[in-house]
């Protein structure tokens, strides 16, 4: 991945290249983004640039042996850590202490297909989408082991930590020691969707960089028209049934939602809240503030004509309650059946 391949943040890319060139690159950088906002491709481009043998015009050459391996994510000095959980495919010993190495091929395959992926897409790729992943102390030990070795080919050993907010206290304390006293020529690149949940002691040791949100054109470049298609279809069908006060038409929706994993259920609720806010803005003549994806436009315009003015606030409250219930492990069939009833009553 070269800087030229990364969408948006033009000035930031230039600044990072200058930091490498002047040997002023911080050894620990916390890249903060919205879910799927481009921090991973930026981190990969920075790592490739820092290890390139023939940098030119503020970008890596793309053809040297180091760049060739970075492009395929197979460079021996490039390491990844990300939240994981046990799966049936793991051995009994691996299930007791799952770490990123067990899922590395799935992670790199996903990153090569679409480096702008979000948390839920990661879990689906790892086949743990019915669970919340975490980064354990066993992972922190592996980080220490990997970074204690000398760089085999590159100028820098690079450790990319995706979602450090998923790290527990014990793991964080162990990682903190490595960040405070890093081995020579080590680069930590942390990518966070919720930086306030990253352990404060780790945040304070990192150079924090907040990525600018993508504008509409940039989002359309990244996301195909089918982006969020299944969730968009589900919430559209549900709201159309609600606007008609057709309880029976909601049954397939809540039954399907009840069958998915908790993380997918929460993602649906969060997407639905944003979708409903966009409908509200369009209904009130504030379309310019709605940031509507082209694939959403027809459904949002139609629903803006059918939902009552008092519906929106009540609906958001209902969805907030659903998220709390899902996090509390309440029976999902009860949760989503009640959600549909409550949305109908809100009309």
Question: In which residue ranges do the predicted regions lie?
Answer:
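Conserved strand-to-helix beginnings and helix N-cap segments that scaffold or border functional pockets
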Residues: 169-173, 266
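Conserved adenine-binding aromatic site and its adjacent loop/helix in ATP-hydrolyzing domains
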Residues: 145, 177, 204
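Charged, glycine-rich active-site and insertion segments that engage polyanionic ligands
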Residues: 2-58, 65-69, 181-347
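Structural recognition of the conserved hydrophobic beta-strand(s) that form the central parallel beta-sheet
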Residues: 158-162, 175, 186-192
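Conserved catalytic/switch belt of AAA+ P-loop NTPases
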Residues: 148, 173-187
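N-proximal short alpha-helices
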Residues: 112-116, 132-133, 137-140, 148, ...
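Clamp-loader machinery-focused feature within the broader ASCE/P-loop NTPase space
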Residues: 2-170
């Amino acid at each position: 991945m070269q800087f030229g391949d990364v969408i948006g943040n033009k000035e930031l890319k230039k600044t990072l290249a200058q930091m490498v060139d002047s040997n002023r690159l911080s050894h620990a950088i916390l890249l903060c983004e919205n879910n799927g906002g481009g921090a991973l491709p930026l981190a990969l481009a920075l790592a490739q640039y820092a290890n390139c043998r023939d940098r030119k015009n503020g970008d890596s050459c793309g053809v040297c042996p180091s760049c060739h391996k970075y492009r395929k994510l197979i460079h021996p000095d490039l390491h990844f850590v990300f939240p994981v959980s046990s799966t049936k495919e793991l051995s009994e010993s691996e299930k007791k202490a799952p770490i990123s190495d067990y899922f590395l091929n799935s992670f790199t395959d996903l990153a090569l297909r679409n480096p702008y992926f979000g948390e839920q897409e990661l879990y689906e790729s790892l086949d743990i989408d019915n669970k919340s992943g975490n980064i354990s102390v066993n992972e922190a030990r592996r980080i220490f082991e990997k970074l204690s070795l000398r760089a085999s080919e590159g100028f820098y050993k690079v450790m990319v930590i995706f979602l450090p907010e998923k790290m527990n206290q014990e793991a964080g304390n162990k990682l903190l020691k490595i960040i405070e006293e890093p081995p020579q020529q080590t680069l930590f690149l942390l990518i966070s969707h919720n930086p306030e949940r990253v352990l404060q002691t780790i945040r304070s040791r990192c150079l924090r960089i907040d990525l600018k949100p993508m504008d509409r054109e940039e989002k359309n470049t990244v996301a195909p028209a089918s982006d969020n298609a299944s969730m968009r279809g589900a919430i559209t069908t549900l709201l159309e049934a609600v606007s008609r006060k057709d309880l029976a038409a909601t049954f397939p929706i809540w039954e399907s939602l009840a069958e998915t994993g908790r993380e997918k259920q929460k993602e649906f609720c969060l997407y639905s809240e944003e979708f409903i806010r966009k409908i509200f803005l369009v209904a009130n003549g504030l379309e310019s503030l709605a940031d509507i994806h082209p694939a959403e436009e027809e459904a949002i315009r139609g629903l803006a004509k059918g939902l009552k003015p008092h519906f929106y606030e009540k609906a958001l409250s209902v969805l907030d309650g659903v998220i709390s219930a899902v996090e509390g492990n309440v029976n999902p069939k009860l949760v989503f059946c009640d959600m549909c009833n409550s949305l109908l009553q809100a009309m």
